[in-house]
UniProtKB/Swiss-Prot annotation:
Catalyzes the GTP-dependent ribosomal translocation step during translation elongation. During this step, the ribosome changes from the pre-translocational (PRE) to the post-translocational (POST) state as the newly formed A-site-bound peptidyl-tRNA and P-site-bound deacylated tRNA move to the P and E sites, respectively. Catalyzes the coordinated movement of the two tRNA molecules, the mRNA and conformational changes in the ribosome. Its main location: cytoplasm. This is Elongation factor G. One of its GO terms (biological process) is ribosome disassembly. It is found in: Cytoplasm. The keyword Cytoplasm applies. The lineage of its organism: Bacteria, Pseudomonadati, Chlorobiota, Chlorobiia, Chlorobiales. GTP binds at residues 17-24, 90-94, 144-147. Belongs to the TRAFAC class translation factor GTPase superfamily. Classic translation factor GTPase family. EF-G/EF-2 subfamily. The gene is fusA. It comes from Prosthecochloris aestuarii (strain DSM 271 / SK 413).
Length: 704
């Protein structure tokens, strides 16, 4: 199957936004206009094509990034009439699903950032924006819901500038706002566009309304000044009264967007079909193709040398698995982005992250949750493979003869856990397997068992995250389960470096056990996890026993010395030891490693850590005092407050343990008029009195 369009005519984009900015509706309209949908779905009635899981339809929020593909021919400018393929990844807007946003941004080349014209920049917009900055994703902004009462395009542009530190540059301004929203002034062509009142998908071009002429001129100069950073000649021509062609403006707008110096900003109302076609034109015109993004970097799995792959079909195949999903009809789907080369259905690839070979069964392109079989995929494509057994999110897939490992994805640790138990014997048989499948799909979801109680524990990024997963157990896997109260995922760490000897000796005639290790244990920067350094010289411990020492340490890390919580952020250096020709074994060194680590931690000022959450509450002014007082009573630290869209916002850092059931309290305190968002910030040392209480509670539990 030959390429349908050249690589320079491919756009891999995401649509990123706050939870209610109208993301799914906008994607629906895109698919409708690009000819992939016959009937437009509405999120209000649970009929939207992109929201394809039962829970998404019910809650009206998007949970799984569905990947879809469509084609578009711009109607103006340099790309006019040229067919382009747009691959879209719909990303969720709720903070509990930040991992979905993170992994989609990793494989995108550009993004459309959606803002609500009434709400402006909301808390999740900031989170998603920071994630996009991390990957240097060029963006176009689309101010949606211009037809709503209270819509204010210019106020939203101002909030993008102030709250996100971005440089939004309007390439359109609205004709009317709220119920009077009738169309836009196109600042590139200096023409008015008036949408049909009944069906916004049709419009007519008119002269710029008389009362908007001076405003349109002001914003056109603003646009030319903004792009002059990339090309000064354009502004000079304008100021000297010379004619500037449309194509000149478009070319420089594209350069400035790709350089990340500006965010071209448009407006519309997706629900009323107004503005989506112009947004599609801008996606093609301003966002990068894989050719613009250039080579992808990686390293050789054996030699560690740096390697680059060119985005070409002729280059060796390299791709990144960014999502695992279970499809009710075809089973496990591995979504991946092809960075270079061509991959054929039925061929073999190397998973260079694990070193295992995998056979590609079928190759599918997804249109939301509908499938289309492909015989091959090319550089720049986003597709799904069926039949891959051991590929996980973030693994590199590549040509066996030319191995490469692309940069890995890093996911946050879960912060909340609950006990889960099956309702019946039949459920009991299916629970383990079903949870394993869910954990395979979602790197921030963990399953473990409490050795003391035998309970199964599930951990995730928030209450909603776990609620949705328990719901999926019921719907997709037909497993009924009871869940306990949410528990905080506490951690332990150390504050100083110490040396310690770990010794395991059992010698009383016959085959004994002998292992002795000298360890240096020191604290690591937060979030670094565990680092093991083998500093053994002169073979004082044979090489084959060294991995066993590390395994013993990692076993011991699961159960901290203060209250039995996992230990994190430690570096362990094995620098000396002894072995016995006959009695030493892997088991002896594993136990010695474990004993040595536990002893070291006891001396290294161990402390208990708890997850600290970033909380933002938006409330009517009359409840501000109550909200702040309540946050302070929850050990919260108020970090800032201000005015937003006629309401007050409060930013605070609050321990997760104090936030359970907060939504109910907030609702009753503000008569349902306030709302809040919460996301994990970092682990933080627990105050002494609370640490002692936790210690006692744990001792009592162990005594039982």
């Amino acid at each position: 199957m030959a390429r349908q369009v050249g690589l320079d005519k491919v756009r891999n984009i995401g649509i990123m936004a706050h939870i209610d900015a109208g993301k799914t509706t906008t994607t629906e309209r895109i698919l409708y206009y690009t000819g992939r949908l016959h009937k437009m779905g509405e999120v209000h009635d649970g009929g939207a094509t992109m929201d394809w899981m039962e829970q998404e339809k019910e809650r009206g929020i998007t949970i799984t990034s569905a990947a879809t593909t469509c084609f578009w021919e711009p109607r103006y400018g340099i790309y006019k009439g040229k067919n382009h393929r747009i691959n879209i990844i719909d990303t969720p807007g709720h903070v509990d699903f930040t991992v979905e946003v993170e992994r989609s941004l990793r494989v995108l080349d550009g993004a459309v950032a959606l803002f609500c014209a009434v709400g402006g920049v909301e808390p999740q917009s900031e989170t998603v924006w920071r994630q996009a900055n991390k990957y240097n994703v060029p963006r176009v902004a689309y101010v949606n819901k211009m037809d709503r009462v209270g819509a204010d395009f210019f106020e939203t542009v101002k909030s993008i500038k102030e709250r996100l530190g971005a440089n939004p540059v309007p390439v359109q301004i609205p004709i009317g706002q709220g119920e009077m929203f009738a169309g836009v002034v196109d600042l590139i062509r200096m023409k008015g566009i008036i949408y049909d009142k009944e069906d916004g998908s049709t419009y007519e071009e008119v002269a710029i309304p008389h009362d908007l002429e001076s405003e349109a001129k002001h914003w056109r100069i603003n646009m030319l000044e903004a792009v002059s950073e990339v090309d000064e000649t354009l502004l000079e021509k304008y100021l000297e009264g010379e004619d500037i062609t449309e194509d000149e403006v478009r070319k420089v707008l594209r350069q400035a967007t790709l350089a990340g110096t500006i965010i071209p900003t448009l407006c519309g109302s997706s629900f009323k079909n107004k503005g989506v076609q112009f947004m599609l034109d801008t996606v093609v015109e301003c966002l990068p193709s894989p050719v613009d993004v250039g080579n992808v970097a990686g390293h050789h799995p054996d030699t560690d040398e740096d390697i680059v792959r060119e985005p070409k079909d002729e280059a060796p195949f390299a791709g990144l698995a960014f999502k695992i999903a279970t499809d009710p009809f075809v089973g496990k789907l591995t979504f991946f982005r092809v960075y270079s080369g061509v991959l054929k259905a039925g061929s073999y690839i190397l998973n260079s992250t694990t070193g295992k070979k995998e056979r590609i069964g079928r190759l599918l392109q997804m249109h939301s949750n509908k499938r289309e079989d492909l015989t091959e995929v090319h550089a720049g494509d986003i597709a799904a493979a069926v039949g891959m057994k051991d590929v996980k999110t973030g693994d590199t897939m590549c040509d066996e003869a030319k191995p490469i490992i692309l940069e890995k994805m890093v996911f946050p640790e879960p912060v909340i856990q609950i006990a889960i138990e099956p309702k019946t014997k039949a459920d009991s048989d299916k629970l383990g397997m079903s949870l394993a499948k869910l954990a395979e799909e979602d790197p921030t979801f963990r399953v473990s068992s409490d050795e003391e109680t035998g309970q199964t524990l599930i951990a995730g990024m928030g209450e909603l995250h776990l609620e949705v997963l328990v719901d999926r157990l019921k719907r997709e896997f037909k497993v009924e389960a009871n869940v306990g109260q949410p528990q905080v995922a506490y951690r332990e760490t150390i504050k100083k470096a110490v040396d310690h000897e770990g010794k395991f000796v059992r010698q009383s005639g016959g085959k004994g056990q002998f292992g002795l290790v000298n360890l240096k244990v020191e604290p690591l920067e937060q979030g670094k996890g565990y680092e093991f350094v083998d500093a053994i010289k002169g073979g004082v411990i044979p090489k084959e026993y060294i991995p066993a020492v590390s395994n013993g340490i990692q076993e011991a890390m699961k159960d901290g010395v203060i209250a039995g919580y996992p230990v994190q952020d430690v570096k362990v250096t094995l620098y000396d030891g002894k072995y016995h020709d006959v009695d030493s074994s892997e088991m002896a060194f594993k136990i010695a490693g474990s004993i040595g680590f536990k002893g070291a931690v006891r001396k290294a000022d161990p402390v208990l850590l708890e997850p600290l959450m970033k909380v933002e509450v938006i409330t009517p002014e009359e409840y501000l005092g109550d909200v702040m007082g309540d946050l302070s009573s929850r050990r919260g630290h108020i970090e800032g407050m201000g005015d937003r869209a006629g309401a007050q916002f409060v930013k605070a850092k609050v321990p997760l343990s104090e936030m359970f059931g907060y939504s109910t309290v907030l609702r009753s305190m503000t008569q349902g008029r306030a709302n809040y968002t919460m996301e994990f910030e970092q682990y933080h040392e627990v105050p002494k009195n609370i640490a002692e209480a936790l210690q006692e509670k744990n001792s009592a539990k162990n005594a039982d």
